[in-house]
Amino acid sequence: MEHTKKFKSLNLHGFDRSTEDYGKRPFVLTAKLLEDQKKAIYGCAFNQYAGIDEEQAVATVGGSFLHMYSVPIDINNIELQWSCNFPTDKSSKVEREESLFTVTWCYDTYEAENDRNPFKVVTGGTLGHIYVIDYVSRKLSNRLRSVGWEINDIRTCPANSNLIVCASSDQSIRIHHIRNEACLIVIGGLECHAGTILSVDWSTDGDFILSCGFDHQLMEWDLSVKQVKEHLERACKALHQDKINVLTQSQDIPYVSKGTMRKSAVSRNIPDKEEDQLLELHRELIPRPSCLLPIYTPSSVSTDMHSDYVDCIRFLIGTNYALSKGCGNEKAIHFWRFGPPKGEVENRIHGNVLRPKSCTTKFRTMNVPSGSAWFIKFAVDPRRRWLVCGGAGGSVMFFDLRNNEETNPTHTCSVGSRTVRQASFSTCGRFLVLVTDEGFVCRFDRVSASVDAKDLAKF
């Protein structure tokens, strides 16, 4: 109770608060919760579609469980709303246990137009299934398939809230619509990553995807080309209906016509009802054209930015700048973009113009002292001020993105004794949640520059 009084006295989220942050301690740890399963929690995500002044909801995943929490504004607490369990895969001959690694939120536009709950929670992990759960009913809305191995990262398209992209250990990237079981686009092949893909992200306009993984490479995939845009538009239009899973993922077999059959009575100008009936039968039996569009070649590739595994990559919101984290022996986050410095042109005269671009411009490197462990996802503040990254030994590191000269964390703290796996900001930027290998869910609140330092020291 005394702790709650101190929290309220800070008035961290009052409307009279300054928009500037308290530099020495930009965020304060206000709540910490241990999940009942007491297993490692690998992923967390705020509902990015919640209003700024609405109570924020955050999902966490670890083991076979998905937990849903609310983050009240005026109380320093993390309140459990509900949870669900995905224990085993009974569809296979050998039962395998699910272990969830990543989670995101989607907004189903068809449900919204029909005055039904549009919020969906999407998660995946070891079994390669993508589960779409209705936030209100808590029931499984859809199960997306086609991924061949573990799912390591799922991200929602900022420009189309029905689309997700996932990174898989099967060395492929897939784009799904949450209302269709089969994927719409598969990215892979000889020009793709040569190992497990650990992380992906969309550009703000949805035209590009970044990817990274075990092979140290950074890749950019162009979705703005006409063929890809038209394919996605057709698919989204077909799926904008009450029925789900209407598109099939089969071999793109040409539509059967009389021209593709043996020389028939048509060429002899003699009616042949039997052949016409056979033609109709072929049309019924042969699947419709596939909803799957393959992409084999990235638009840009970097092979020398990182020297070890790259386990997290993110676009800086609203820009074409990127942040990527190396682990193992590297332990650093790089701030960069594809393309030459401003005013310069990439020289490709002696190269194959059909090959991906390889030029990059690096602006800054941030050291991550306790970042040797892999599968740690950082988060970028929606206000583009702070980058927060977890590390081994429960460490949490805050980097000031406005201070280009600083290479080390501006502020560090500890939330436990084991690795912090992921950080997630609320859309308003006032709340931060982190999850750990110990099973802790940790809440941080943003500290305004106008907060009395004496009051903050008491908390």
From Swiss-Prot:
The keyword Transcription regulation applies. Disruption phenotype: Double RNAi-mediated knockdown together with mes-2 RNAi results in ectopic expression of the homeobox protein egl-5 in the head region. This ectopic expression of egl-5 in the head region is enhanced in a nfya-1 bp4 mutant background. In addition in this background in males, there is ectopic expression of egl-5 in the mid-body region including in seam cells and hypodermal nuclei, and there is ectopic ray formation. Its main location: nucleus. Polycomb group (PcG) protein. PcG proteins act by forming multiprotein complexes, which are required to maintain the transcriptionally repressive state of homeotic genes throughout development. In association with the nfya-1-NF-Y complex, may play a role in repressing the expression of the homeobox protein egl-5 in tissues such as the head. PcG proteins are not required to initiate repression, but to maintain it during later stages of development. The mes-2/mes-3/mes-6 complex may participate in the global inactivation of the X chromosomes in germline cells. Keywords: Developmental protein, Nucleus, Repeat, Repressor, Transcription, Transcription regulation, WD repeat. This is Polycomb protein mes-6. One of its GO terms (biological process) is negative regulation of gene expression. It is found in: Nucleus. In adults, it is predominantly expressed in the germline, and weakly expressed in intestinal cells. SUPFAM superfamilies: WD40 repeat-like. InterPro entries: PcG_WD-repeat (IPR051243), WD40/YVTN_repeat-like_dom_sf (IPR015943), WD40_repeat_dom_sf (IPR036322), WD40_rpt (IPR001680). Interacts directly with the N-terminal domain of mes-2. Forms a heterotrimeric complex with mes-2 and mes-3. Does not interact with mes-4. WD repeats lie at residues 146-186, 192-231, 305-346, 370-409, 415-454.
